[in-house]
Structures are given as C-alpha cells and as structure tokens.
Swiss-Prot record:
Disulfide bonds: none annotated. It comes from Mus musculus (Mouse). The modification N6-acetyllysine is found at K353. Residues 1-42 form a transit peptide. Thiamine diphosphate binds at Y155, R156, S204, G236, A237, R262, H333. This is 2-oxoisovalerate dehydrogenase subunit alpha, mitochondrial. It holds the Pfam family E1_dh.
Length: 442
C-alpha cells in the first residue's frame, strides 16, 4: 500500500515545504467523501479497490511494508548555523524591529530561566523547568500566530507567553504562588495561564491538552471564527493515548489546529531511540490524514515560516497541521532531574556551543549589522535587572489566604467544601503556631 505524498516547495512564506495528505475545502462547510465518489466511478470490483477505509491499488505480490526503506522526512531550514540565509526565496524578510523582538524575547527567557533555576536550588521556590535550547521553537511559532489564536501549552512554552508580552511580574508571582498569582498559589510553578492572552492554563498530566485543544478548534470551526488553535507537546507526550485520540479527532472533524511537537531528544530520561522506532513524529501525520512538516527547531525563521503557512491554510481549509520541530533540551528535564545520569556532558556541550538557537539568531543579527557587542552587553545587563526587579517584588509578596484553597471551582460552594473550609480554619486556629501564617494574607 502506498500513500500519496506531495512535496511542494513554493516561494517565500508559502514554501514551508508541507507534506500533504488530506482533503481541501472551504472553511465551515462539509465536504463530500472521496471514497463515496470512487464507488460511483468504478462499477466492477475487479477494476479498483473500493474498500471505504483506504485508497490503494491491488497487488499480486506478498510484501510487508518495511519502515527502514521509506525515506525519512527532510528537515526544513532557512538559515544555517552561521546565521546565513540558505535560499533567498525562503527569507521571511522580517523588519529589523521584529527580529530584534525575537532575539530579546529569547534572551530574556534565558535570563529568567537562569535566575529562577538558581532560586529553586536556594530553596526560594519549590520547582522549576528551564527552556534552554528550545527558545527558537517558542518565539518563532508565537510570532507567526494572531494574538487571538488560542494556545494550549505543555509545560515548556513560557516563551510563547513572553512573546505575547506577559509581564515578568506575573511569571514570578506564579512561580512563588503569591497574592498576585492569577492561580492564587494553587498550581505548580511554571504552570502559567492567561485568559487575556489566550493561553490556556497548563496541566501537569502529559498530553491531556491535545484532545482538549481539538475540542476548542472544533468549536472555533462551528462558530466560523477566524482563528486557530495551536497545541504544544513534546515527543514523549506523543506516545500517550490522548495524542492518538486528538490527532484522529482533528483529522476526521477537520479542525483548524496546529499540533506543534517539540522533539528535544528526551522524554525526561528516555531518549528518542527508546521511545519509538518510526521516523519521528511528523511521519505519523499522514497516517491520520494530517498535513505534516519537520523543521529545524533551532532555526527561528524556519519555525516562523512553517507556522505562518500552517496557520494560513488551517484557517482557509479547516484542516489540522502537524509541525515537528527538531531541537535539543540543553537543561535538565526539571529541578527534580539530574540529566548527567543518562547523557554525557560532551553531548550537552555540543548542542549548547555548536547549535544554540540564540547563538544562531545573534549571528544573523551581526551579519545584518543590526546588533553589536556593545548592544549585547547593554541588553544582557538590562534584561538581568528587569528579571531581578520582578523577582524581588514577587519574593516580598504574601501568599494567598489558605481559605482560597476551596474557591473558584463551583459558582456556589457545596456543603462538603464549606465543611472542609471550616475544618481547616479551626485547625489553623488551634495549631497556627506550627505554620508560617505570617507569610500568608489574612
């Protein structure tokens, strides 16, 4: 059985070199099924297969499809490791200020990561997850979206929020769980959410966001809204059953959604060689009928072009798209992880020194004459000052009142929750000296 794959390099933003396998149509309208059309075209079963579940030819030779003889999906890139544009027709020709925003967002995220990681090591916050090495996937994709597009993140997409101008003070407040935290201290650190910036609150269990994002995209389609949903996840989450359910629902219901997979090499401590045997995550898309592409995740322009084109077509065609961004997780999985137990220092240093997305974009800026060493020093100093000011403010704030543990779930608090709230109040009144209640809002 062979699947029809069309590799269509086009020009400019529309190249995005998408692997096509699916149906096109008008947004918001149902389309006829190709299998039904074929049944009308072929009156004899001897002419063509007419099974409704697949499109294929009959063969008279017994042969199993071998996964290792199918050529791998290529990796789309725009600039090389030296920051040089490879094919001028693929240059997105972004204005200087926008590219500088890319760079400032990526480096500001990197600075915030370093400070919050160290603060966890000092016992100031309970947990943290860095984004080292994956900054290009965040910023490149976020820049290609409209501000009203709905984002479902996993737990390593802080750069998407940062590009949407989420305040540093709220990043810090969430990690500290203080009174300014929109979640009122009830979420783990790095589990951000912001309704005003259309960023759905992050949930810890892997892949739960995938079918939820498909439901949101289906709702957008039903409303005929000019928006899409983007759903981020890692290659490890793609092994969860929710990923299969989400992909299949999106394809069969024809939802305007971008599945954005950050393939960073590891699912916590499990390398990709032990996660799957096929050709990565992008290769799964055609099996579901999803248009797919693999991009260099360390090339912010490749990520931007692919996401921009996928968004345009998702809106126009009411179709799902899958982007697999190949990158590398330079940091530990989290502050609860020690990656030296399962990978070498040389491996990490290679990606940090030889193919870092920030270094590549900086080199591009230097090549263009848009950045120099003096600006670099000044910005590094300024960005650290901004992060430290927000950090110190968040640390001084009180924690939310413990009674808020029970609020914001039901419109009217049920009797059982009221009893639990009253029980906690009595407990703290009796044994309050054993708790740091002076750190909490009264």
């Amino acid at each position: 059985m062979s699947a029809a794959k069309i590799w269509r390099p086009s020009r400019g933003l529309r190249q995005a070199a998408l692997l096509l396998l699916g149906r096109s149509g008008v947004r918001g309208l149902a389309r006829s099924h190709p299998s039904r059309q074929q049944q009308q075209q072929f009156p004899s079963l001897d002419d063509k297969p007419q099974f409704p579940g697949a499109s294929a030819e009959f063969v008279d030779k017994l042969e199993f499809i071998q996964p290792n003889v199918i050529s791998g999906i290529p990796i789309y890139r725009v600039m090389d490791r030296q920051g040089q544009i490879i094919n001028p027709s693929e240059d997105p020709h972004l204005p200087q200020e926008e590219v500088l925003k890319f760079y400032r967002s990526m480096t500001l995220l990197n600075t915030m990561d370093r400070i919050l990681y160290e603060s966890q090591r000092e016992g100031r916050i309970s947990f943290y997850m860095t984004n080292y090495g994956e900054e290009g996937t965040h910023v490149g994709s976020a820049a290609a979206l409209e501000r009203t597009d709905l984002v479902f993140g996993q737990y390593r997409e802080a750069g998407v929020l940062m590009y949407r101008d989420y305040p540093l003070e709220l990043f810090m407040s969430q990690c500290y769980g203080n009174v300014n935290d929109p979640g009122k201290g009830r979420q783990m650190p790095v589990h951000y959410g912001c309704k005003e910036r259309h960023f759905v609150t992050i949930s810890s269990p892997l892949a739960t966001q995938i079918p939820q994002a498909v439901g949101a995209a289906y709702a957008a389609k039903r409303a005929n809204a000019n928006r899409i949903v983007i759903c981020y996840f890692g290659e490890g989450a793609a092994s969860e059953g929710d990923a299969h359910a989400g992909f299949n629902f999106a394809a069969t219901l024809e939802c305007p959604i971008i599945f954005f997979c950050r393939n960073n090499g590891y699912a916590i401590s499990t390398p990709t060689s032990e996660q799957y045997r096929g050709d990565g995550i992008a290769a799964r898309g055609p099996g579901y009928g999803i248009k797919s592409i693999r991009v260099d995740g360390n090339d912010v322009f490749a990520v931007y072009n692919a996401t921009k084109e996928a968004r345009r077509r998702a809106v126009a065609e009411n179709q799902p798209f899958l982007i697999e961004a190949m990158t590398y997780r330079i940091g530990h999985h989290s502050t609860s992880d020690d990656s030296s137990a399962y990978r070498s220092v040389d491996e990490v240093n290679y990606w940090d020194k030889q193919d870092h997305p920030i270094s590549r974009l900086r080199q591009y800026l230097l090549n263009q004459g848009w950045w120099d060493e003096e600006q670099e020093k000044a910005w590094r100093k300024q960005s650290r000052k901004k992060v430290m000011e927000a950090f110190e403010q968040a640390e001084r704030k009180l924690k939310p009142n413990p009674s808020l543990l029970f609020s914001d779930v039901y419109q009217e608090m049920p009797a059982q929750l009221r009893r639990q709230q009253e029980s906690l109040a009595r407990h703290l009144q009796t044994y309050g000296e054993h708790y740091p209640l002076d750190h909490f809002e009264k």
